[in-house]
């Protein structure tokens, strides 16, 4: 795996997440009904970080849940993906809430579609919003994030790797080639 470019370092990731936290608070006029749901693996620590930044702004931390979605594919060898929700209990109530799904990279949109289906299966939220650290384009479904840390145009033979301290022992985002 050859690194082509580092597109975010630790400070850039933090700045993006702080901005996303402010945007979530501003758009929703506070956090009264806001629930963050991280998509495993890296969406969960991102959701926790955003919740921490929101608590610094609002003096109160929004609830954070997690959603486990697995893809029926090897991410590095094929573009055919069929998301599967592994666990339906996300740890937070979504009925009547503004659910902000948090993930590291949006690509085709299929993972987010599976996540939205899983959230709706748990009850009727007031709204579902989407926060992504990286939007790399190449959507196959009409899904657009509400909050984006960084737009990174890529080719289909490139991979965007988000590395986070909680999972990878380092904070950075790099582009590699397949």
From Swiss-Prot:
One BP annotation, GO: DNA-templated transcription termination
UniProt-listed Pfam families: Pribosyltran (PF00156)
Reaction(s) catalysed (UniProt annotation): UMP + diphosphate = 5-phospho-alpha-D-ribose 1-diphosphate + uracil
Extent of motif PRPP-binding: 99-111
Region forming the signal peptide: none
Highest taxon of the lineage: Bacteria
MF terms (GO), sorted A to Z: RNA binding; uracil phosphoribosyltransferase activity
Protein name, as recorded: Bifunctional protein PyrR
Family to which this protein belongs: Belongs to the purine/pyrimidine phosphoribosyltransferase family. PyrR subfamily.
Broad class of enzyme this protein falls into: transferase
Keywords, sorted A to Z: Glycosyltransferase, RNA-binding, Transcription, Transcription regulation, Transcription termination, Transferase
EC assignment: 2.4.2.9
Protein's job: Regulates transcriptional attenuation of the pyrimidine nucleotide (pyr) operon by binding in a uridine-dependent manner to specific sites on pyr mRNA. This disrupts an antiterminator hairpin in the RNA and favors formation of a downstream transcription terminator, leading to a reduced expression of downstream genes. Also displays a weak uracil phosphoribosyltransferase activity which is not physiologically significant.
Originating organism: Thermoanaerobacter pseudethanolicus (strain ATCC 33223 / 39E)
Originating gene: pyrR
Listed SUPFAM superfamilies: PRTase-like
HAMAP family for this protein: PyrR
Gene3D superfamilies to which the protein is assigned, alphabetical: 3.40.50.2020
Assembly description: Homodimer and homohexamer; in equilibrium.
């Amino acid at each position: 795996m050859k690194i082509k470019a580092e597109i975010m370092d630790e400070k850039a990731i933090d700045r993006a997440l702080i901005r996303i936290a402010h945007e979530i608070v501003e758009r929703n006029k506070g956090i009264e009904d806001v629930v963050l749901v991280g998509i495993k693996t890296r969406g969960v620590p991102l959701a926790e970080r955003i919740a921490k930044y929101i608590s610094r702004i609002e003096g109160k931390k929004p609830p954070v849940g997690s959603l486990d979605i697995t893809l029926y594919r090897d991410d590095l060898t094929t573009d055919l993906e069929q998301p599967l929700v592994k666990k339906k209990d996300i740890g937070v109530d979504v009925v009547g809430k503004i659910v902000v799904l948090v993930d590291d990279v949006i690509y085709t949109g299929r993972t987010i579609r599976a996540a939205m289906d899983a959230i709706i299966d748990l009850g009727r939220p007031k709204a579902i919003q989407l926060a992504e650290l990286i939007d790399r384009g190449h959507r196959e479904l009409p899904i657009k994030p509400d909050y984006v840390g960084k737009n990174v145009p890529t080719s289909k033979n490139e991979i965007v790797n988000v590395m986070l301290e909680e999972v990878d022992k380092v904070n950075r985002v790099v582009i590699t080639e397949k």
